Structure formats: structure tokens, C-alpha cells
A protein has these predicted regions:
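Mixed-charge, polar/low-complexity N-terminal
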Residues: 8, 35, 87-88, 108-109, ...
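Short alpha-beta junction capping motif
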Residues: 53, 100-146
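N-terminal Sec-pathway targeting helices
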Residues: 1-19
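Basic side chains
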Residues: 3-6, 51-52, 121
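Aromatic-Pro/Gly-enriched surface loop or interdomain linker
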Residues: 14-102
Length: 146
């Protein structure tokens, strides 16, 4: 009988600790976010041309999957119809001085959480100040919560 009670006791303690840990991680992520950054430059297509658009859909917070997936073909259709080149990524490594200047417009497509490092934010801000076009779609403003 004591073996059964010990087993039940340790099972209860284990379950309690597991649930507490899960809730703690969930609360931490909800309040502070857990950010993953891409800093290495990425491989871009060679045929970008003079009218090129970057569609950036990274989510370090809540991911609006349905909205992101539904919008990508629409951006492709618009680009094709207007003769624009389009590049879609969730890799923030493209936010560097050498690659960002290859685009005339950047669309933040339902981005959430803090998706750029401080250095990438500085580069992006300068790119906008130098005349780059920026469009923020739906949750793109969610980055301001951090």
C-alpha cells in the first residue's frame, strides 16, 4: 500500500511541477516573447531588377498563419500584373546594407514580435529615410509592443 501511495504522491508532484513549468514558460513568452533572429545575409535571386518588392512575414509573436498564407499569392499576382519582381521571406538576414538597397518597397506581412536586431532596425530605418517604401499589413504594428 505504501508503494502505491508513494507512486501517487510522486506522480502528483511531477504533474504539478510540469504544469507549473509550462504555465511559467507560457506567461514569460506572452509577456516578453522569445525572439529568434536571423543575421546572416541570405541568397537572393539574381534577377531582381529596378522594380523589386520584399515581402517579409516573420513572426516572433503570434503567427497569423491564415492571413499570411492567403496574402502571398495575391502579392505574387499584383507583382506579375505590374511587372515587379517579388521576393518573399521570413528570414531577417536580408535586412543588411548590401541587400536591402536592392528593393524599392518592403511589405511587412503580418509580422509580430521583435523580428529585427537593433542593428537591422537601424539599417531599415535609414533605408526608409533614404526613400525606401514601407507597407505594414495588419499585425505589422505588433512589433511596437516590445
Amino acid at each position: 500500500m505504501t508503494k502505491i501511495l508513494k507512486y501517487l504522491f510522486y506522480s502528483f508532484v511531477g504533474a504539478f511541477l510540469s504544469i507549473t513549468l509550462f504555465i511559467g514558460v507560457f506567461i514569460y513568452k506572452a509577456k516578453r516573447g522569445i525572439n529568434f533572429y536571423h543575421t546572416d545575409p541570405i541568397e537572393l535571386p539574381l534577377n531582381l531588377g529596378e522594380k523589386s518588392i520584399l515581402v517579409f512575414s516573420k513572426a516572433n509573436g503570434f503567427r497569423h498563419s491564415e492571413a499570411i498564407e492567403a496574402s502571398l499569392p495575391i502579392y505574387e499576382q499584383m507583382a506579375h500584373k505590374n511587372g515587379w519582381k517579388i521576393f518573399m521571406t521570413e528570414d531577417a538576414g536580408v535586412f543588411n546594407e548590401l541587400q536591402l538597397v536592392l528593393f524599392q518597397v518592403v511589405i511587412w506581412n503580418n509580422t509580430s514580435g521583435k523580428v529585427l536586431t537593433d542593428n537591422q532596425r537601424t539599417i531599415f530605418k535609414k533605408w526608409i529615410e533614404d526613400g525606401g517604401g514601407f507597407i505594414g499589413v495588419h499585425a505589422a504594428g505588433d512589433d511596437s509592443h516590445q
